[in-house]
Amino acid sequence: MYSSKENVNILTALLVKFGISKAVVCPGSRNSPIVHNLCTCPDIECFPVTDERSAGFVALGMSLADNEPIALCVTSGSALLNVAPAAAEAFYQKRPLVIISGDRPAQWINQQDGQTLQQHGTLEPNVRKSVTLPEPHNE
């Protein structure tokens, strides 16, 4: 597809396969390969929003208005925490949001350094599923 990171290409292909045609994207370094892929994919229309909390509610509003699942892509660390209010609203309104966060390599998590908090499960219990994609390997 578009990225040198195979897991990003697989993610993009799966989003398209399962009916994602719109994505709200926020700037960041950790999610930049994902944002680039989404925004160059001819099957996905991207809507950039700078503030993650606002982006969450923009995505929720789009899901309500269009009655379709919307992807929301943010960077690592506290950016994911900022979408928690919209994630909770979407969960209780039964509106499909696919929330994607770019994260640091696993060995960098929980190192008492800024923006290295645990991402997996951060939005639970207000999401139906939380998954972590495997990191790409050079094998």
Model-derived regions: residue spans:
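N-terminal alpha/beta PP-like core and its mobile active-site loop of ThDP/TPP-dependent enzymes
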Residues: 1-139
